[in-house]
Amino acid sequence: MGQHQRTSSTHLPILYNHLLNCIFNNPHYNKSPFKNVVEELRTKHNQYTIIVPSAFVLNEFYDPATEGSSNRVLLKELCYNNEEFIKSHIIQTGSPVSSTITPISKEQLVIYKTMDNKQVLLKNRMIYTGKGFRRSLKLKILAVSYFRSFCDYFPKGSQFMLVHIESTLFGGQPYIKSSLPLAPILNVNDSSTASKSNSLTLESINNKIKNESVTFEKLLRNFPLLARAVGDKFNRLFHHNNHQFYGLRSNTRKKLEHIKIEFHKILDEAFKIILDSVKEERPNGEATYNLINHIISIHPNLNLDKLVHEYVELNLYDVLWSQLIYQYNYPNDDKADYDPSATKVMTSAKYEQLSCLSLNQLDVPLNKPWQLNELHHRIYQAVQELKKLSTSSTTTSTLAAKMQIIYNTINILTNPSQHAPMAPDLVIDADTLMALLIMTIVHAKVDNFEAHLFYIESFSASDVVCDGHFSYIMSTLDAVICHLSDNDKGLNTLIQSSQQNLELWSAIFELDLVSITKIVESFKNAALLPEQHCLKSRNISGEGALTFALKANNYDVYKLLLDGNPNWFTIDDILYEKNVVTNQNLLMCALLEETKEQIVLDLLETITENATVKEQQAYYNMQDLSGRSIGHYLFHNMSLISKIGHLIDWELRDRNTHTPLFSLCRCYDHPEYIELVQAGFEAVYLQLDKMRNNHNQNICSNGTKIETDACKDARDGIHINNDNSSRGIDFEKHIDKNGNTLLHVILKGIPETRILSRELNLIDVNISNYRHLTPLMLYVKYGRLENLESILADNRLDFLAEDPSTHYNIFDYLSFLAGRYAKENVEKIEKKLIEFYFSHYFPFEAHYKLVALNGKYDPSTRDWYIYYRAEDQKALRPKSLNSLKHILYLEKLQRPFTTFIDSDIFWRNYATNISTTPMFHKLRVNSLIHRLNILFQSVACQNIGDSRANDLFNRFLTNDEDELVLELKKKITDLLELKKLKLGEVKLKVGQVQEIEYFLDYCLDEMRRAIQIFSKLSKVAIIGEQKQIDVQNVENSLLYRFDVERFFQPFKTLTENETLVRVSGSLGNFGDYLVWIELAGKELLKNIFKISADIQTWKDLYHAIYTINRDLRSMEYPTGSLPTASSNAKETDPKALLREGGNTLSRTPTNSSDYTACNFDVPNTVVDDNEGIFNLLASSKRSKYKKLVVARADLVKQIMKLNVDIKWLHEIIATELSQFIKFRGRFLEFSTKLFVNEEMRSLRKRKLELEKFLYKVKNS
């Protein structure tokens, strides 16, 4: 069956999606398994929604039910052979099983039945299979759309609701499945022995981690026997009423060694508790012993002594730490004699004295600027780590936490920075480490630092104390403390250096030129500054005197420092001076602080004159902590763009994915915004032109001896637009994390930036951000009038694009502006949009123009309201769908025999009394608005120069909804009758009727041919749209997979990507217009049939009257006396027949007919009884005569009415036919123009995508 379906030539080209093909393009629709499905959809298509799987899945995947079979069945075969598969993908949206709304997220959950009574759940753009399905699946909804039917077995113009999903509701497996395992990741330098050793090392590491996670407290929790054996004894040992160790709980002065001894006594008691618990004489002693052995077997290399030691220390931490704090904070008056180890060296006063100490004053053997930056960065990180000792959280109030902090601090100081190390090969020797630790301790300002060190040294386990690395760390820290003690000779030097730094920095911030001059003059004659001089000092963040001068924002201070001696500050000192915390250099700091332009230009001049171009590029594009370069901060000083813009990497992204050009466009509060973005774009264009010219020059230097035109142009500086190396801005590199492009974020100045007008710019004006907003939608949403004017002038614009998730169009966003912006600005935006619509989507020569903009749902009335605008009016009252139905009904009633579409046909796809899925609510109204606008366009085309279009539009513009429909119906009926009466006396002869009939027969043939032509055209257009969609989807997938990063992505990526799914094409809308012409022609055809039926009735009446007249003549004249020749000559003329009827019939002209009946009087004579049978026969003859006269009078009345109706209808149809001939030409021309414009826009977009692809290929 499926094979026959695909080889048959009796249907239109096969659709790529086989499920749609088997429903809408099936020559065997009246046979199983399609018959029941098609019949149900034919009669109730508004009550069903078709779930459409990805065409890629249907063609490439197979049915999971046949996975284990030798003959696997492709899913596309199920579309032609399996009725269950087809019915399972059609849901009854007209009658949902249940519908609920979640209380918090307000998501709507709706359960529907399929055509074969299975259940599916729709929730948050996802579909879930339920009752009746063999597999429970969760599938992503990619899009929703309407499918235009083109087949003859569905009603003409019917549209079906589609929900596109990533796979089928039956599931699907890739047809080609790789059976090869993934190759292991190997190191080519490793041998098999090395691999084995690595695995052993990994195993040992895992065991170590496993053992380190074990604590004695966990053992007590996990093994109740052990807890019962030792738990109570440990509780008594640590209890505060334990008088055996009362000395640790009393805050009295004592030596630190005494505290240490007391701790070890308690530790010995703890060990004794463990040993006593495993003695044989103890209850459960043997069981405890076996348990401990079992624990050791579970955790190899477990040190139980260490666990007990840590357990004791943890329980005594508060007691021990409070004792240490008390002893160290005791006055130092006699500590030298009583207990020198308890002397507090690092006091608050000393921290204050050394607060401005700089690394260059500690005799560090490293003096390169980039090396010092790396050291300062390490110091800052180490300070932040060491400061954790000052916190009193539970994570730092343990011995293990203190040790970890010390370890981390040393690691930070001795290892390169994790993020962008400035000197990764830097070697830290012992002297350097001492200097780094001094800076770290001095600036961390940890109170009671000595107490922390004593605690670590005195209360650690024996294996830790004996560790060589740990011992070296602690001895180094002791040396630092000793170096900073009052007994050390170098302390005064450090304090003096810190004081000099403080004086210099204070003088700079206080703008004390006298003090600064004094400091500068003291070494003015020196060729080089000493490395320890305060002018080379830096704070903990790496900021030096020049940075402070920029922040002081005083040109005299800056020049005094920089020009004091040219040899004092080299170009390296200037380039590498930066804040190591934020990684911001001097120029960044100047821009952020908005330093005076004179200072900035002087600094820029210094860099330009002394640094190479590569050094400048590296300097300007250096990124700070937030990923921003100088280019991101150029909006602080716009004049720098023209000076260094050609050296800026405009595609460099910060952590917010903003490029420098993107940042310029987002400076909405800049007073000179247009000049700012113009300067930025011109700098980018200049940079691109230089790249192109360099490329052309390289071609010239490496090419043949003959100098080509391109080489000449490059030599002369001429820009070559058609060169392969030419390119504009790569806008894909300027998209932020929300999907916004430069066109989205720019506030104004589109003409000045040439973002749209520059031919080399590969920009998509209709690109959507991740919220599905196009630039046009954003301009309307945020009231950007200037940008709106610019983008409306671009012929690539998709004006009627909709948000695929909410289905909002541009007029919906226009309606959101009310109350948010100035009324005048909103009116200007509205005027621009309405003018654009009428100039591009409405017949230009139409005198009356009306457009339906958008729809809104009113919860109070539970109805949708359609908003309208006329060309010369502003605010109009919206019409509800109920009112709209009344208007169209009354319009058709007023013009019953025109080409105006019948109301039932117009509302064929919009049964408002039938529910649908929440995803289709707005889409259905948008589709109705589209159809309504086609109605307005057709009326305007059909009645150019006629007032009837204005009459229809006035029904939409006026507020007469209060008038009852029945009253209006009566008025319209009376008006039509009045029009008939105005025709006056109507006389139709047989010849006239025959002429009308001949005219109608000719019109009938012509209309049938025309309708047949438009029917074929509409079919071709509608199926052409499906082929357009198929081709676009395949091309989208191809371009998507051509990307190197996506080429080897799994199949599922293609089916889940919403951006690869197209659901409409330019031929679809064109098909709607062709269908409209066809429907209008069928309306006219129906009217021709109506008058043809009236003419046939007129003929029948005429024949009946003729027969009655003949019978009447036979009663009035004897048979032999009837004239023969004259009688035969007058048979076809009713007037003659009436004249021969004697005195009982006469010709009486009326307003309605040529013939009527006079008063018929039967002789009132008395019948004599003697006459007998003759009187009886005479009475019977008179009765029959009277009946014939009455019957003839009734027929004459009917034919009189038909005379009026035929003449009235003939005039209307003649007029309508003439109008239709003009209308179909105008409307076809208008719709073709719309189609061509839309197709050109679509082709421009595809051309843009291919150009982007070629650009990526060339630059890959």
UniProtKB/Swiss-Prot annotation:
InterPro entries according to UniProt: Ankyrin_rpt-contain_sf (IPR036770), UPF0507/Ank_repeat_27 (IPR051248), VPS9 (IPR003123), VPS9_dom_sf (IPR037191)
Residue ranges of domain VPS9 in the record: 336-493
GO CC terms in record: early endosome; late endosome; plasma membrane; transport vesicle; tubular endosome
Single biological process term from Gene Ontology: early endosome to late endosome transport
Recorded superkingdom: Eukaryota
UniProt-listed PROSITE patterns: VPS9
MF-aspect GO terms: guanyl-nucleotide exchange factor activity; SNARE binding
Gene3D superfamilies given in the database record: Ankyrin repeat-containing domain, VPS9 domain
Family annotation (PANTHER family): ANKYRIN REPEAT DOMAIN-CONTAINING PROTEIN 27, DOMAIN PROTEIN, PUTATIVE (AFU_ORTHOLOGUE AFUA_1G09870)-RELATED
Family: Belongs to the UPF0507 family.
Name under which the protein is recorded: UPF0507 protein LELG_01076
Organism: Lodderomyces elongisporus (strain ATCC 11503 / CBS 2605 / JCM 1781 / NBRC 1676 / NRRL YB-4239)
